[in-house]
Amino acid sequence: MLKRFFITGTDTSVGKTVVSRALLQALASSGKSVAGYKPVAKGSKETAEGMRNKDALVLQSVSSLELPYEAINPIALSEEESSVAHSCPINYTLLSNGLASLSDKVDHVVVEGTGGWRSLMNDLRPLSEWVVQEQLPVLMVVGIQEGCINHALLTAQAVANDGLPLIGWVANRINPGLAHYAEIIDVLGKKLPAPLIGELPYLPRAEQRELGQYIRLSMLGSVLAVDRIMA
């Protein structure tokens, strides 16, 4: 059984967190135990409990087990620390150990990335290098907006060039007024080398909703049944 997935996006703010939430909820509804994992979270805020990131808290809220925050988000960076101009080395061993620990506890771990596939960490390395090291299959979130076809095709090509399998994509309608939505979905369906596994409509406060019904796990049926996928 394939245990771990990495969620990337065509850009920043395209809905990786709400899609991760939807996938976690869909898997949980199918009877699986799940955990969300946000290895590096930028723009975190200081709280009485320590540094916290709103996206990581969403993942924590839909995980099957009651896990400490640090198990969901081992590296929480403040707004200042998130800048590539701020030298803050990333402990990739810590990220790997955290992922391994979660993988031992649940059936599936949904790993949410930071920014897009080539978004740089503070050490000027993309998180995708760690994803390649961990050999995680990739699900892509496409924020449906002007220019998203180009961004989606470039992201899919970059994932393939890195030797990882793109096992599916999710359309997230982030612009309710966008014309030609259906045509964009049709073109992406024809051009992307992976199946469309879900469409999320535009929903206010989506991070607080039940979203599992928008994910078609049947499109991942054969993928979920194997231990590893080759690109």
UniProtKB/Swiss-Prot annotation:
Alphabetized UniProt keyword annotations: ATP-binding, Biotin biosynthesis, Cytoplasm, Ligase, Magnesium, Metal-binding, Nucleotide-binding
InterPro entries to which the protein is assigned, alphabetical: DTB_synth_BioD, P-loop_NTPase
Primary location group: cytoplasm
Superkingdom of source: Bacteria
Documented EC number(s): 6.3.3.3
Annotated pathway: Cofactor biosynthesis; biotin biosynthesis; biotin from 7,8-diaminononanoate: step 1/2
Residue positions binding ATP: 13-18, 55, 112-115, 172-173, 201-203, 208
Residues that coordinate or bind Mg(2+): 17, 55, 112
Top-level enzyme category: ligase
GO BP annotations, alphabetical order: biotin biosynthetic process
UniProt-listed Pfam families: AAA_26
Cellular localisation: Cytoplasm
Quaternary state and interactors: Homodimer.
PANTHER family: ATP-DEPENDENT DETHIOBIOTIN SYNTHETASE BIOD 2, DETHIOBIOTIN SYNTHETASE
Protein purpose: Catalyzes a mechanistically unusual reaction, the ATP-dependent insertion of CO2 between the N7 and N8 nitrogen atoms of 7,8-diaminopelargonic acid (DAPA, also called 7,8-diammoniononanoate) to form a ureido ring.
Family: Belongs to the dethiobiotin synthetase family.
Annotated HAMAP family: BioD
UniProt protein name: ATP-dependent dethiobiotin synthetase BioD 2
Annotated organism of origin: Salmonella typhimurium (strain LT2 / SGSC1412 / ATCC 700720)
Encoding gene (name): bioD2
